[in-house]
């Protein structure tokens, strides 16, 4: 083990222990999830971010490839109070810097009180406060990463499943479990690149246009926004997380960056129609500020931000949280049944996962 340093945007430099060497920079964020570290670390929505785990011990049930949400680790670096050797070895193999041995409660409070901030990390034998500060100096804002979609999307189209309902899934950084949720309910999913064209959508003749989750600023996903504008009123449209934000922007709404976002597996959401509160998995740093032509049907109990946007006349259903969970509670997996029913009135929902 060797030295590591975190240079914060506040001007502070925090000393830590290097568990996987390297230099990194990104937006410093935290998750309050106490399980599901395999899924979180492979969630494309964490691209270009430095992920801090609020829970003090990460790795106490090993690393299982079958639990991953993509083919690689996506955070630029990982920060924890304590990482097990299994997780540290995995991150080292992936080439992702990792540090521990610090009180992450202090970092979480800094982010909560001051908002998400940029950070530079230096870990390993050549690390110093100066090298960490150099990483910070070169760190672009998340909104400036205009090509982030290219780093998390498929390059060419893929097909999953062989069901009766056809879903055109625009991959802006999709989690594997979202695709699995559709396939388990009898759908054929055409996974298309983030910059898919209207012609690409037309080629698969979908019953449903789905905009996936993903990282970064929704304003940087013009191609997906154009698809919504092109197909609204013609094909039912759904989206999750970043997808909700993109759909709202396409339909006259707007988005904004949050102070520190929602990242965890216990975010309470209130449904206006039923009065029911459900626990949800969330991972986002932007939110819908103006829903445009859509109606807000669910809100976050903690801060009132929109968690669901619907329009029966336009055949639109979106969710800011992750109904597929992985990790997290399964309270809202019925969303996939709802959107498939919207796409095909004759569709019979499969048994819930």
Curated annotation (Swiss-Prot):
PROSITE patterns per the UniProt record, alphabetical: GATASE_TYPE_1
Residues making up the signal peptide according to the UniProt record: none
GO biological process, one term: glutamine metabolic process
Binding sites annotated in the UniProt record for L-glutamine: 45, 214, 216, 242, 245, 283, 285-286
Catalytic activity: hydrogencarbonate + L-glutamine + 2 ATP + H2O = carbamoyl phosphate + L-glutamate + 2 ADP + phosphate + 2 H(+)
Region ranges (CPSase): 1-166
Entry's Gene Ontology cellular component terms: carbamoyl-phosphate synthase complex; cytoplasm
Keyword set, alphabetical order: Amino-acid biosynthesis, Arginine biosynthesis, ATP-binding, Glutamine amidotransferase, Ligase, Nucleotide-binding, Pyrimidine biosynthesis
Catalytic residue list: 241 (nucleophile), 322, 324
Subunit structure, interactors included: Composed of two chains; the small (or glutamine) chain promotes the hydrolysis of glutamine to ammonia, which is used by the large (or ammonia) chain to synthesize carbamoyl phosphate. Tetramer of heterodimers (alpha,beta)4.
Described function: Small subunit of the glutamine-dependent carbamoyl phosphate synthetase (CPSase). CPSase catalyzes the formation of carbamoyl phosphate from the ammonia moiety of glutamine, carbonate, and phosphate donated by ATP, constituting the first step of 2 biosynthetic pathways, one leading to arginine and/or urea and the other to pyrimidine nucleotides. The small subunit (glutamine amidotransferase) binds and cleaves glutamine to supply the large subunit with the substrate ammonia.
Family: Belongs to the CarA family.
Protein's UniProt name: Carbamoyl phosphate synthase small chain
Organism, scientific name: Halobacterium salinarum (strain ATCC 700922 / JCM 11081 / NRC-1) (Halobacterium halobium)
Gene name of this polypeptide: carA
């Amino acid at each position: 083990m060797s030295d590591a340093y975190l240079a914060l945007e506040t001007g502070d430099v925090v000393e830590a222990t290097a568990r996987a060497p390297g230099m990194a920079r990104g937006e410093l964020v935290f998750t309050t999830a106490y399980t599901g570290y395999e899924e979180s670390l492979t969630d494309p929505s964490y691209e270009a971010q430095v992920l801090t785990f609020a829970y003090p011990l990460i790795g106490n049930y090993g690393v299982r490839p079958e639990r991953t949400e993509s083919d690689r680790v996506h955070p630029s670096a990982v920060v924890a109070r304590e990482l097990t050797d299994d997780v540290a070895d995995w991150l080292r193999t992936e080439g992702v810097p990792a540090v521990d041995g610090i009180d992450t409660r202090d970092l979480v409070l800094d982010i909560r009180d001051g908002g998400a901030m940029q950070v530079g990390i230096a870990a390993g034998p050549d690390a110093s406060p100066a090298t960490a500060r150099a990483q910070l100096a070169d760190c672009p804002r998340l909104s400036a990463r205009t090509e982030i979609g290219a780093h998390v999307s498929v390059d060419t189209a893929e097909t999953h499943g062989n069901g009766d309902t056809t879903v055109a899934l625009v991959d802006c950084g999709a989690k594997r479990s979202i695709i699995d949720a559709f396939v388990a309910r009898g759908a054929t999913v055409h996974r298309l690149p983030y910059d898919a064209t209207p012609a690409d959508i037309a080629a698969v003749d979908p019953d449903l246009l789905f905009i996936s989750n993903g990282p970064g600023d929704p304003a940087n996903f013009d191609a997906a926004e154009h698809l919504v504008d092109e197909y609204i009123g013609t094909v039912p449209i759904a989206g999750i997380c970043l997808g909700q934000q993109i759909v709202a922007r396409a339909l006259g709404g707007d988005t904004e960056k949050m102070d520190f976002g929602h990242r965890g597996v216990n975010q309470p959401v209130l449904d206006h129609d039923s009065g029911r509160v459900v626990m949800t998995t969330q991972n986002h740093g932007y939110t819908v500020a103006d829903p445009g032509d859509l109606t807000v049907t669910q809100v976050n109990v903690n801060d009132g931000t929109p968690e669901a946007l619907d329009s029966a006349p336009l055949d639109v259903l979106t969710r800011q949280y992750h109904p597929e969970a992985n990790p997290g509670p399964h309270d809202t997996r019925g969303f996939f049944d709802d959107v498939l029913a919207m796409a095909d009135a004759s569709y019979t929902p499969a048994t819930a996962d």
